[in-house]
Curated annotation (Swiss-Prot):
Organism of provenance: Protochlamydia amoebophila (strain UWE25)
Record GO terms (molecular function): rRNA binding; structural constituent of ribosome
Cross-referenced InterPro entries: Ribosomal_uS11, Ribosomal_uS11_bac-type, Ribosomal_uS11_CS, Ribosomal_uS11_sf
Keywords: Ribonucleoprotein, Ribosomal protein, RNA-binding, rRNA-binding
Subunit text: Part of the 30S ribosomal subunit. Interacts with proteins S7 and S18. Binds to IF-3.
Superkingdom of origin organism: Bacteria
Pfam name, any one: Ribosomal_S11
GO biological process: translation
Record's GO cellular component terms: ribonucleoprotein complex; ribosome
Protein name as annotated: Small ribosomal subunit protein uS11
Annotated coiled-coil segments of the chain: none
Species lineage: Bacteria, Pseudomonadati, Chlamydiota, Chlamydiia, Parachlamydiales
Family, per entry: Belongs to the universal ribosomal protein uS11 family.
Role summary: Located on the platform of the 30S subunit, it bridges several disparate RNA helices of the 16S rRNA. Forms part of the Shine-Dalgarno cleft in the 70S ribosome.
Length: 135
């Protein structure tokens, strides 16, 4: 049995689908105690742009600040508006400090906010919460 000659072919990457013009979408804001993550999707749920406090060069305890959430929201909104997005619905999730400031960041970047929805999951007495912090 002869061996096949070794070929130096790289694996083929799938090309990203170019979004032509997406006029409206949904901004999902997940604000945890340690970070804020913003994902802007089209109405069917495909992610168009995203940003987090860590992506815009905040690290450590500064990631959990309201200012970091504002900068991250502006970063995600600029990318989405360059693809033609004009208006968004906002879904807020989580108890973090960046909830309201992320909404302000989306507005200041030029997106029109049509609705604000709070989709924070509330337990029906599920897992035991973490212990109280004593400073």
């Amino acid at each position: 049995m002869s061996k096949q000659p070794a070929t130096n072919k790289k694996p083929v990457k799938a090309k990203k689908k170019a979004f032509q013009n997406v006029p409206s979408g949904i901004a999902h804001v997940k604000a945890t105690f340690n970070n804020t993550i913003i994902a802007i999707t089209d109405p069917s749920g495909r992610v168009i742009s995203w940003a987090s406090a860590g992506k815009v060069n905040f690290s450590g305890s500064r990631k959990s600040s309201a200012f970091a959430a504002t900068v991250a929201a502006q970063d995600a909104a600029k990318t989405a508006s360059s693809l033609g997005m004009k208006e968004v619905e906002v879904n807020l999730k989580g108890p973090g400090a960046g909830r309201e400031s992320a909404v302000r960041g989306l507005q200041s970047a030029g997106l029109t906010i049509t609705a604000i929805r709070d989709t924070t999951p509330v337990p029906h007495n599920g897992c035991r919460p973490r212990k109280r912090r004593r400073v």
